[in-house]
């Protein structure tokens, strides 16, 4: 009779090596060298020595994890959040704000091959005015989880506090948890969004099954007692207003209305400073014609219109164009027009572009603006401000402007998301005469 033997499981002992960290990358990972290879080690800071084991070994680099830290950097901080290290939201609470800003600025300078002239920043804590919290019902405990995703996982970290949220939203977390955990429908809840607008606080609840009248009544009572504007979302397309009027926020002296699902910059303080800096960099004059590409609902467009002769905002999403037009009317601005266009096509042939533009601002999504760089060059503006949420696509797009005779006059790191690996930036290009 044949006999079958199970194969012996291979056991490998990972070698412990001692490294010295000399840099911090923009994602908050310590950078060290070992045997001629770059090592990325989460949790370590420059000037720290540690025993580590390699977890991933590639041809050009390797990743490692800390076994034992042997020394502490003078810029090491005690994380404020008890969930830090498990929650995927923040990566850099263990580093001083100054070190975070220096490392991000250095990464930006390397990509752009140009010195970073300034950092545009605001308060490092309590800055986030929007949060989307995942909801998950646990049948064994009959409890509702509410929180953010774990780092590198779809599992939820059940958060009790979040010090990067604006204080009004952080204070709401236990109350929202208690309310949602008391609903009959807690098995059928997807996520809850909290937004702090100038007009007040919004709560948007995504539910995957119809709510009972008792649940609706509980939610309405909760929204009234906490002074919230309540919105219910039975699917991704429908949004029911239960209480509250059109929300709005202040932007450089103007009032911008938005729909609860519209994109708004989550850091109000940096947004205000960013818009003010963009206007200063463009040096907008009363006779200028200014073009704002990827304009959204007018975050830059409307403040520009307070200083220029005329402003054209161009956006690829029709609903945002309508919102921009509405915001222009609400603020009594008659020298600004919004257009819905496919920005991958040649917009320079449109009637509104025939007189050209003196200045151009663009604020594209992460994919960048490769399709419009040649169009901007055709317009021959004197100054261009490019606001970026992805330094890699910014560096790529900048090459076209540099080849066309523009130079980088100013480069700023926008500290829009302190304690995270997100790096945003703003560049001023000037045309060489």
UniProtKB/Swiss-Prot annotation:
Active site annotation, chain numbering: 389 (nucleophile)
GO terms classed as biological process: rRNA base methylation
UniProt cross-references to PANTHER family, sorted A to Z: 23S RRNA (URACIL(1939)-C(5))-METHYLTRANSFERASE RLMD, RNA M5U METHYLTRANSFERASE
Catalytic activity reported: uridine(1939) in 23S rRNA + S-adenosyl-L-methionine = 5-methyluridine(1939) in 23S rRNA + S-adenosyl-L-homocysteine + H(+)
Enzyme Commission no: 2.1.1.190
UniProt entry tagged with the keyword Nucleotide-binding: no
Record-listed [4Fe-4S] cluster binding positions: 81, 87, 90, 162
Entry function: Catalyzes the formation of 5-methyl-uridine at position 1939 (m5U1939) in 23S rRNA.
Designated gene of the protein: rlmD
Gene3D superfamilies for the chain: 2.40.50.1070, Nucleic acid-binding proteins (2.40.50.140), Vaccinia Virus protein VP39 (3.40.50.150)
Protein name stated in the entry: 23S rRNA (uracil(1939)-C(5))-methyltransferase RlmD
Record-linked NCBIfam families: PRK13168.1, rumA
Pfam families: TRAM, tRNA_U5-meth_tr
Family: Belongs to the class I-like SAM-binding methyltransferase superfamily. RNA M5U methyltransferase family. RlmD subfamily.
Annotated GO MF terms: 4 iron, 4 sulfur cluster binding; iron ion binding; RNA binding; rRNA (uridine-C5-)-methyltransferase activity
Keywords on record: 4Fe-4S, Iron, Iron-sulfur, Metal-binding, Methyltransferase, rRNA processing, S-adenosyl-L-methionine, Transferase
Membrane-spanning segments: none
